């Protein structure tokens, strides 16, 4: 099971196959080793890590770009680490703790008593979880940091522990759950070094890489592990139903590494560490399989987040569930034909949305988009995300046992 740190819901076990299922799981105090973030019940004080301040690297542009410099065999990984160590930080997710006990909170939640909501809002900020981040740009008086979305998910405030041991407040510039990326900003006066992105298109299996981050939290900030690129472009399916192309590496990725840097021998960030494979779909324990978001995708997303604060993606304007996820007993109640095995059941159609305007109805089953088979939510997203908002796609639905084709103009999310 590929895991990061986004939620702890158990996924149904599937028989072993070629597909890798990526699930998100918060690494909590009762959790197992699942990947990039470390969560604590409470922490009053952060341990300040030691680090050497590097010469300041100033970037005047308001967006990031991929470097044209390529990795050479003669480069040492020690030199590569020195090129990024001042730019890799610990990201601290802070939440306000309610004054009421866990039992009282549960009772109030179940029976609608929100009298303690104000005490929660005014409660003391405490460390909920930790991850890593990379300072990649200095512009307009701000330092910009890329991290994973799940590292800051649900936070009431965010702090950053710099490589020199100083802790500063950070603001969330933008975040995107689909790619699991987020951008933070801090005052530029605290930035002593920025990392440079390499070109992930030219990666090859067997290349030496290092992972830099804060495994187990800020106590082990600036930890570096070494490995190779196991696969430069591995396609996996995440728990949110999206297909994602990632870099596979055997460099050790531990809780707290999420959002940290995967670095080549030229000292360039070629990926943002995000997930690790804890076990296969049949429950077999797995070692040495971790995944990073390719730098070229990171650059595209962070530039958009800095510019707009969010990522706009095309959608149909429907709520769906894969037929494979509908229990047999419910299929007859939903009037799904017994011979229809694969597809996406439409549970809800947004009023005046693109699908509604095209004539799609609740109860329809999407079987194809642009002639391509749609078997699950991941395949639907994969097709839709290859288009832009405003594009028109041909959607084939099964309605009462008959295929119906409709033209749908994609709307934005």
UniProtKB/Swiss-Prot annotation:
Keywords: Cell membrane, Hydrolase, Membrane, Protease, Serine protease, Transmembrane, Transmembrane helix. It is a single-pass membrane protein. It is found in: Cell membrane. Residues 305-401 form the PDZ domain. Substrate binds at residues 256-258, 316-320. Its EC number is 3.4.21.107. GO terms for molecular function: serine-type endopeptidase activity. Gene3D superfamilies: 2.30.42.10, Trypsin-like serine proteases. The keyword Secreted does not apply. The active site is at residues 150, 180, 258. Its main location: membrane. One of its GO terms (cellular component) is plasma membrane. GO terms for biological process: proteolysis. It is an enzyme of class 3 (hydrolase). The chain crosses the membrane at residues 20-40. It catalyses: Acts on substrates that are at least partially unfolded. The cleavage site P1 residue is normally between a pair of hydrophobic residues, such as Val-|-Val. The keyword Cell membrane applies. Degrades abnormal exported proteins and responsible for the propeptide processing of a natural pro-protein and for the maturation of a native protein. It also plays a prominent role in stress (heat shock, ethanol, puromycin and NaCl) resistance during active exponential growth. Belongs to the peptidase S1C family. This is Serine protease Do-like HtrA.
């Amino acid at each position: 099971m590929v895991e990061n740190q986004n939620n702890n819901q158990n996924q149904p076990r599937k028989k072993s196959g070629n597909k890798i299922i990526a699930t998100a799981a918060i690494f909590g105090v009762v959790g197992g080793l699942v990947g990039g973030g470390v969560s604590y019940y409470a922490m009053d004080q952060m341990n300040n890590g030691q680090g050497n301040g590097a010469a300041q690297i100033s970037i005047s542009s308001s967006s990031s770009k991929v470097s044209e410099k390529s990795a050479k065999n003669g480069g040492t990984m020690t030199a590569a680490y020195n090129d990024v160590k001042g730019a890799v930080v610990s990201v601290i997710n802070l939440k306000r703790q309610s004054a009421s006990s866990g039992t009282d909170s549960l009772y109030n939640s179940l029976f609608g008593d929100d009298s303690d909501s104000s005490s929660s809002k005014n409660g003391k900020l405490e460390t909920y979880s930790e991850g890593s981040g990379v300072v990649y740009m200095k512009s307009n008086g701000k330092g910009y940091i890329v991290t994973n979305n799940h590292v800051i998910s649900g936070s009431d405030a965010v702090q950053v522990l710099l490589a020199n041991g100083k802790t500063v407040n950070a603001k969330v510039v933008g975040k995107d759950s689909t790619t699991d990326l987020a951008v933070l900003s801090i005052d530029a006066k605290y930035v002593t070094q920025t990392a440079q992105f390499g070109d992930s298109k030219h990666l090859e299996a067997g290349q030496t890489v290092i992972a830099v981050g804060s495994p187990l939290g800020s106590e082990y900030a600036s930890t570096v592990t070494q490995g190779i690129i196991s696969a430069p472009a591995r396609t996996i399916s995440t728990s949110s139903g999206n297909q994602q192309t990632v870099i596979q590496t055997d460099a050790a990725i531990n809780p707290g590494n999420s959002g940290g840097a995967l670095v080549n021998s030229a000292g360039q960030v070629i990926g943002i560490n995000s997930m690790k494979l804890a076990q296969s779909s049949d429950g077999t324990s797995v070692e040495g399989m971790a995944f990073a978001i390719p730098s070229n995708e990171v650059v595209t997303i962070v530039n958009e987040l800095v510019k707009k604060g969010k990522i706009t993606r095309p959608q149909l304007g429907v709520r769906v569930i894969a037929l494979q996820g509908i229990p047999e007993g419910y299929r007859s109640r939903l009037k799904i034909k017994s011979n229809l095995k694969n597809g996406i059941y439409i549970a809800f159609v947004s009023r005046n949305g693109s699908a509604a305007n095209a004539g799609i109805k609740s109860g329809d089953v999407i079987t194809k988009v642009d002639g391509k088979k749609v078997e699950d939510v991941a395949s639907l997203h994969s097709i839709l995300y290859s288009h832009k908002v405003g594009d028109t796609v041909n959607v084939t639905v099964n309605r009462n046992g008959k295929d119906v084709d409709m033209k749908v103009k994609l709307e934005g999310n």
